[in-house]
Amino acid sequence: MARYIGPVGKISRRLGIGITEKGQRILAKRPFPPGQHGPSARRRQVSDYGLQLLEKQKARYIYGVLERQFRRIFEKAQRFPGETGAYLLILLERRLDNVVYRLGFATTRAQARQLVTHGHITVNGRKTNIPSYTVRVGETIAVRPESRRRMYFKNLVESGALAKHKAPDWLRLNPADLSGEVVAMPRREDAEPGINEQLIVEFYSR
């Protein structure tokens, strides 16, 4: 499945939020949209539709989800009682690639997605190579025993980096075992900050 592999700095500046750590660093240095005239350039006022589109794109790029898949997640969120926007972000948080990232097994969601697709991750002991898999309470996410011998994972444990990692409250991390458990459902406030989900709801409600 195709993924955006372009310059994260340019996208981060266009969206006004760092979609990766690298994007955050670039945005801190150049906190204005890309363009040859720099920060002093006068730009057209963005329409309501433009703001809604921008917010949807922001969430998509942060979580690394393609348009068609993002639309399916939104439609699934609509079936839940309560606030659709909040459930949209909760469903994005429950993606397996995001959980691998939140547990500290990867430094970016793109890397986490790669670990999943390459077969390094198990769910309840079974190899799962689908990044969009939705985790449930009680499930254990771990690095495959065969993969733990790889230098990347050995360094992750031996360097102490994983032991220092702070997983969110809805996940319980076991650094020594390269595993984690889903102990609760994520809440709206557990999602990535800086996303106005109501604008996304308005975009799809046009």
From Swiss-Prot:
InterPro entries in alphabetical order: Ribosomal_uS4, Ribosomal_uS4_bac-type, Ribosomal_uS4_CS, Ribosomal_uS4_N, S4_RNA-bd, S4_RNA-bd_sf
Top-rank lineage group of the source organism: Bacteria
GO BP terms, alphabetized: ribosomal small subunit biogenesis; translation
PROSITE patterns documented for this protein: RIBOSOMAL_S4, S4
Pfam families reported in the protein's UniProt record: Ribosomal_S4, S4
CC annotations in GO: small ribosomal subunit
Domain named S4 RNA-binding: residues: 94-156
GO molecular function: rRNA binding; structural constituent of ribosome
Ribonucleoprotein is among the record's keywords: yes
Signal peptide: none
Keyword tags: Ribonucleoprotein, Ribosomal protein, RNA-binding, rRNA-binding
UniProt subunit comment: Part of the 30S ribosomal subunit. Contacts protein S5. The interaction surface between S4 and S5 is involved in control of translational fidelity.
Entry's family note: Belongs to the universal ribosomal protein uS4 family.
Function comment: One of the primary rRNA binding proteins, it binds directly to 16S rRNA where it nucleates assembly of the body of the 30S subunit.
NCBIfam families reported for this sequence: PRK05327.1 (NF003717), rpsD_bact (TIGR01017)
Annotated protein name in UniProt: Small ribosomal subunit protein uS4
The species this protein was found in: Roseiflexus castenholzii (strain DSM 13941 / HLO8)
Lineage summary: Bacteria, Bacillati, Chloroflexota, Chloroflexia, Chloroflexales
